[in-house]
Structure formats: structure tokens, C-alpha cells
């Protein structure tokens, strides 16, 4: 064989060997998925106010978590997208889940009750009520929360 024929054969073999062998290979190759910025998971639920946590799990602060419902059916589409997504929330549970709603920890397959998802949020709300306020302001805030005074009342 001549030198050009060998070169062409080598180039052909090289191009075949560097192909991506998984069925849903991302643009840029298999390793490029690690470098890609994570996007937010698809919105779902009533009024699209939640985020997908798994193929049939939709969670939002206002409604909790919906599993296997018509509102969570849209989350199955997430499996067909080539780039990974991040649902949000802090890590919780032993299965590598994320806090999805108040007191709920979800992974891609299920949701469980988790006190760590509840305690920090409640602590943050209590702390923000009193931060930087004198006692008169604190009493007014408490009365407004109880609905006993209007927010526009002056002293």
C-alpha cells in the first residue's frame, strides 16, 4: 500500500474510534457534560410554580410535592433532555436528596419527611422577624401578623 492509502485508513480508523458510544451523547462528547453549567429543572405543577425532582415528582413551596399526578407528568420529559438539571434546595436525607418543600426531602425516585428541611426555614423566618428592630417595632410586627392592626397605622 502506498503512504497516502495508509494515511487515509488511519484517519478513518481514528475518526471511528473517537465516536461517542452512548445513545444520547451530548454535544461536545461524554466528558463535556461535567463542564456544562447546570440548568434549573423544568417547571411543573399548578401554575408552573414547582420544579421537577424526578420523572414523576413535582414539588413547590406553595403546594408540597405531587407524585404520579397529571401535574407531574411533564417531569418525565426531563429524561429526554441531554443536559443535567439542578432542582434546587439544600442536600438532605441518606439517599442524596434535596429539600423540596417545607419538611420534605426528595430524590429522583421518592420523597420522605425530613426535619432538616423544616428546622432551618422556620429558624430563618423567626430570626428575620426580630433582626434590627426595637421592642416597639417587634410588637407592631407581631400585631400585624395576628391581624389586629393595619400595616398603614402610625403611632
Swiss-Prot record:
Disulfide bonds join 20-25, 41-85, 44-58, 52-75, 59-65, 92-105, 99-117, 106-111. SMART domains: NH. PROSITE patterns: NEUROHYPOPHYS_HORM. It comes from the Eukaryota. GO terms for cellular component: extracellular space; secretory granule. Residues 1-19 form the signal peptide. Seven disulfide bonds are present in neurophysin. Pfam families: Hormone_5. Keywords: Amidation, Cleavage on pair of basic residues, Disulfide bond, Hormone, Signal. InterPro entries: Neurhyp_horm, Neurhyp_horm_dom_sf, Neurohypophysial_hormone_CS. GO terms for molecular function: neurohypophyseal hormone activity. SUPFAM superfamilies: Neurophysin II (SSF49606). Gene3D superfamilies: Neurohypophysial hormone domain. The modification Glycine amide is found at residue 28. Isotocin causes contraction of smooth muscles. Belongs to the vasopressin/oxytocin family. This is Isotocin-neurophysin IT 1.
